[in-house]
A protein has these predicted regions:
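Short beta-strand/loop motif that positions the catalytic acidic residue
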Residues: 177-179
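Conserved loop-alpha-helix segment in the C-terminal half of the alpha/beta-hydrolase fold
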Residues: 181-213, 218, 225-226
Length: 243
């Protein structure tokens, strides 16, 4: 694998029921490979709000960027049209086309038997029960991790999944897709459909919905591959060292 430019920024976008801490095991391995990694805290209040929040984070960076989205975060990164963004990485993520909603692609195929029912509260936000994290969100993760995931979960507004998506950047720029073959939240068939439609480079693996926790090395490798393939190398002699 080629080296990664020193001024590259990897921007990590969490999905629903999560915050930036879901990338905790990915950040340092990326930085040991010479790239800055930052998390974009999106509010999960509407797709538009989340796009604006990600745009603000991008304004803090300089140089080329690679956007990485997990689950719902894929819809957010796809809406960014900043010229400094060189590629997209989808980690078991959703990638609606222009005019589609997150809900339309999420429910394209039958949900897994262990997938939780998504019912909004009186404020229009969806929370997950505690056991949803051990049964579906990260069924291969440790009990400690799933307990923390449940405790820090942030609800997602129904507006996020009902708002039509704008024209996606993946139609113009290269994308990578980590397809989670044992995903219990987003049907792997749906992931395959989206990845093929995008023309993404697909990395399929027998991982669950949250490989940031359960297959960290794989996630880091896919991100670094996207960065190396789409950005000019500053130091051709440097080697990428996965951790």
């Amino acid at each position: 694998m080629n080296s990664v430019p020193q001024n590259t920024t990897i921007v990590l976008v969490h999905g629903a029921w999560a915050d930036g801490s879901c990338w905790k095991d990915v950040i340092l391995p990326l930085e040991r490979n010479g790239v800055e990694a930052i998390c974009a805290p999106v509010p999960l209040t509407s797709l538009t709000d989340d796009i604006v929040a990600l745009t603000r984070v991008l304004e803090r960076t300089s140089g080329p960027a690679v956007l990485v989205g997990h689950a719902y975060g894929g819809a957010v990164i796809g809406a960014i049209r900043d010229e400094r963004v060189k590629s997209f990485v989808y980690v078991a993520a959703l990638a609606p086309d222009e005019g589609e909603t997150v809900a339309q692609v999420f429910y394209r195929d039958e949900p897994h038997a262990e997938a939780p029912k998504l019912n909004p509260d009186k404020h229009g936000f969806v929370w997950l029960p505690v056991d949803a994290f051990t049964r579906a969100v990260a069924h291969k993760a440790s009990n400690e991790d799933t307990r923390i995931m449940s405790a820090v979960q942030r609800p997602i507004s129904v507006q996020c999944i009902q708002e039509p998506a704008p024209a996606p950047g993946w139609k113009e720029k290269p994308s990578w897709f980590l397809l989670a073959e044992e995903d219990r939240m987003i049907n792997p068939k749906t992931q395959q459909f989206m990845a093929a439609r995008m023309g993404a480079k697909i990395r399929a693996a027998r991982v669950d919905h949250s490989p940031m926790y359960t297959a960290t090395n794989l996630v880091v490798d896919v991100i670094l591959e996207a960065a190396c393939k789409t950005l000019n190398s500053v130091n051709p002699s440097a080697q990428v060292a996965n951790d």
